[in-house]
Amino acid sequence: MISFFVIFELKKMKGVIHHIEIYVSDLENTIEFWSWLLKELGYVISQQFDGGISYKLNDSYIVFVQTEKEFLNDGYHRKRTGLNHLAFHVNTKVEVDWFTEELKKKNVNILYEDKHPHAGGKDYCAVFFEDPDRIKVELVASEN
């Protein structure tokens, strides 16, 4: 018999993303880009396997897998059908500013710089940028 507490915990998990798997054009560049960022967001490396890596935070994880050669030619573009961007919470505008400076030091392409940090609107504080495959990434402050 399942206890009330087990059922309660299961219901809290309902709807939470279990994992996201992203195919990438160059796994080595992807690892270099994402490792520091995800570490700063609290993720840890969960698995490393031939052709891929996963990072875990609590009960969710993100997997990056090397795209097979035969599928590399088409490339990715966020305006095509499919994923547009990934957005992650940070706590405050101070963190958005810190990440922005770190990204610039790494020569990462910051999007919408003319509207930064309010590209999402006057009451919305975030930094938008691209990973090595030009997947748009957003870090949004929970508090402004």
Task: Please give the residue ranges for each predicted region.
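Hydrophobic alpha-helical signal peptides and transmembrane signal-/tail-anchor segments
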Residues: M1-I7
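Alpha-helical elements of the RecA-like P-loop NTPase motor core of helicases
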Residues: I31-E32, D97, V137
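Core segments of cupin and vicinal oxygen chelate
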Residues: E21-E68
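Vicinal oxygen chelate
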Residues: I17-S25, Y76-N144
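Short beta-strand/turn micro-motifs at beta-sheet edges
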Residues: E70-Y76
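N-terminal beta-strand motif that seeds the catalytic metal site of vicinal oxygen chelate
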Residues: F8-I31, L86, E143
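Acetyl-CoA-dependent GNAT
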Residues: Q66-E70, A141-N144
